[in-house]
Amino acid sequence: MFNWVKTAMLMAAITALFIVIGGMIGGSRGMTIALLFALGMNFFSYWFSDKMVLRMYNAQEVDENTAPQFYRMVRELATRANLPMPRVYLINEDAPNAFATGRNPEHAAVAATTGILRVLSEREMRGVMAHELAHVKHRDILISTITATMAGAISALANFAMFFGGRDENGRPANPIAGIAVALLAPIAGALIQMAISRAREFEADRGGAQISGDPQSLATALDKIHRYAAGIPFQAAEAHPATAQMMIMNPLHGGGLQNLFSTHPATEERIARLMEMARTGRFE
């Protein structure tokens, strides 16, 4: 229930932001257009944002015939978690990473890169996919996917405003201060992600994944490997769509500056330490 409230609040906040931007660019007419655009974006984000994200990564759906071992692993873990079977996707990228998306557990999808399948052992892959299914079980996937698509839309609108400026309803040039304000919208998009996606969510998914797999150590060693390998392998699709970085099990961004705003992951060392403590004590708290 809390995630539903959080999602509704996020949509309302972004709608208000779009209206403000519309006013900066085109006065009252711009505000009306922005409101209609925001309502359309809200509808689109709820129903289609998962498909949009999967398309951004050129993810290919697989089944028991095309990726039998991986598909059966996800099915077994979904059964252990008492979840419906999600759609399963592979992304042809060398960088090791994975994410979950969808609007609810009944319409969920999990995706992994071909790189992560090469780097991790089967036991470690189980830990990673259990983590992603924990996101599904906790209903994190709707807000994370909507946030990614909305932040991307705001950044695109900011770029449009910076290049084309704007005029008010009387045809006069818009307030020059508005241009400066609009130029700051990309950082605002990053800030929205920081507010909406808490680092605590990753810790909870680590804990939930450990419960599903029954093997916290496998996720700990997987995170260590992903962290080490990912540092030297660029994830081109993620670099092109930095607003989606918060969906990944590990931050895929290597750039500095603006891209750091989209980093929402806790320190890998702390995640590993917590998981190893679970393995030592047998307590998933």
Swiss-Prot record:
Binds 1 zinc ion per subunit. This is Protease HtpX homolog. Its EC number is 3.4.24.-. NCBIfam families: PRK01345.1, PRK03001.1. The keyword Zinc applies. It holds the Pfam family Peptidase_M48. One of its GO terms (biological process) is proteolysis.
